[in-house]
Each structure stands twice: as C-alpha cells, then as structure tokens.
C-alpha cells in the first residue's frame, strides 16, 4: 500500500508540475507577444512619420525664415507631432533631427549636432533601431528618414516610457518569478523579480546564465522559460 501511494503521489506531482509549466508558458508567451505588439505598433507609426511629405517639405524649404514656413510649421507640423502624445501617451519625446541648416522648433525639430555624441546619431540604413535604458527608464526608437537626402540628412527619434513598453512582463501569476530581457550581446534591457516568498531564489543575470547552460527546462529549484522578442 505504501508503494502504491508513493507511485500515485509521484505521478500526480509530475502531472501537476507539467500542468503548471504549461500554464506558465502560456502566460509568458502572451506577455512576450504583447511586447512584440507594442514594438510593432510604434514601428508602424514611425514608418508613417519617416515618409511623411509634410515633414520633408518643411525641412527642405528653401526659405526657412519666411512667414509661410513658420505658419506651415505651426498649423501642420505641430499638430501632427502633438497627436503622437495623444494617441501614444507612453511617448516622452518625439524629435526630427536634421543635419542640414534648420531653425530649431521646440523639441520637435532640432539640429543633428545636438546628438552627435550619441550612438543613434547616424543610422547607416533604413532599419528601425531600438535602445533600452534601465537607468533612464526609456525605450528609444531611432531611424533615418529616407526622403531627406536619401536618409543621410535627418533621422527620427522617439523616446518612450520603459514601463509601458515592458508592462506586460509584470506577469499575472501567483508564484514567485523573475524575468530578464536581454539582447544578442547579453546585455540586460529589462529585469523584474518578484521573489516575495522565496527571496533566496532571486538571482543576478550571471547566475541565470549558469543555470541556462545546464538545463533549458527544469532544474531542482527553477522552471526556465524562453521566448524571443522579435
């Protein structure tokens, strides 16, 4: 009887663990999909701005000091940029940086030399580049604007609230858990650890990497789940 009970208990425990892993995987996959959706949404918005004819015409206007140029800036450019914060409240700053001569206009239109020491000053392609800064609490999108001198004359900079982009990583689970988001260079872009009952299991990213190398799924104390943010 004791042997039968042990076998039954072991099998039941295995079934429960497998069910818990499946539930966690579903929750985790949904959280990552939500981040991917956020990134895709903002990338689509940047596509619209990067190829917008109004911005190009204002930036490339021959007489930037004319009243007509200023009027168009106020009546067309400003409302368009203002609308970004209305439709995307997570946006902290949206700026078009131009390498040619430009009359600065608030935070919306600035000379590129102001950013010349930053890594995103000169994207060499038309791809969208993402940067995350845990200390500043920002996620930044940077891309060249192809219609401004073949992409060499200006670029679009959009800074967003870090917590809004990665908000779905606050997993809706009762168990203690931790989340790391890292890039190809193994740099941590986001970290969230909720070890409320078992603080001893909280780990540094280097500890996670050691466990990750040993086993992809189950360890004695952890369940490891992974999914790529596209």
Predicted features and spans:
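Solvent-exposed, extracytoplasmic
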Residues: 74-88, 149-196
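Histidine kinase transmitter module recognition
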Residues: 1-4, 31-34, 38, 171
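Extreme N-terminal signal-anchor transmembrane helix of membrane signaling/transducer proteins, especially
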Residues: 1-14, 18, 22
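Extracytoplasmic/periplasmic sensor domains and loops in membrane signaling proteins
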Residues: 68-81, 104-135, 175-176, 191-221
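Extracytoplasmic/periplasmic sensory segments of membrane signal-transduction proteins
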Residues: 22-119
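A short beta-strand signature within small-molecule sensing/ligand-binding domains used
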Residues: 135-146, 216-230
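N-terminal sensory and localization modules of signal-transduction and trafficking proteins
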Residues: 15, 19-23, 127-130, 184
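Extracytoplasmic/periplasmic ligand-binding sensor regions of membrane-associated signaling proteins
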Residues: 70, 86-160, 167-168
């Amino acid at each position: 009887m004791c042997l039968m009970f042990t076998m039954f208990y072991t099998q039941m425990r295995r079934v429960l663990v497998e069910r818990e892993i499946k539930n966690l995987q579903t929750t985790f996959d949904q959280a990552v999909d939500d981040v991917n959706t956020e990134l895709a949404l903002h990338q689509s918005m940047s596509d619209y701005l990067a190829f917008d004819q109004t911005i190009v015409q204002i930036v490339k206007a021959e007489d930037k000091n004319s009243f007509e140029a200023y009027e168009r800036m106020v009546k067309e450019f400003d409302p368009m940029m203002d609308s970004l914060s209305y439709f995307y409240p997570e946006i902290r700053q949206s700026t078009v940086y131009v390498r040619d001569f430009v009359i600065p206009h608030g935070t919306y239109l600035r000379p590129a030399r102001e950013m010349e020491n930053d890594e995103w000053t000169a994207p060499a392609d038309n791809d969208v580049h993402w940067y995350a800064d845990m200390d500043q609490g920002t996620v930044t999108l940077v891309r060249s604007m192809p219609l401004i001198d073949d992409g060499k004359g200006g670029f679009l900079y959009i800074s967003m609230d870090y917590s809004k982009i990665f908000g779905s990583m606050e997993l809706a689970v009762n168990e203690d858990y931790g989340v790391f988001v890292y890039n190809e260079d193994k740099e941590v872009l986001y970290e969230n650890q909720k070890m409320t009952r078992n603080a001893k299991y909280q780990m540094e990213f280097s500890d996670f990497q050691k466990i990750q190398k040993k086993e992809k799924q189950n360890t004695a104390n952890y369940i490891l789940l992974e999914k790529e943010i596209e």
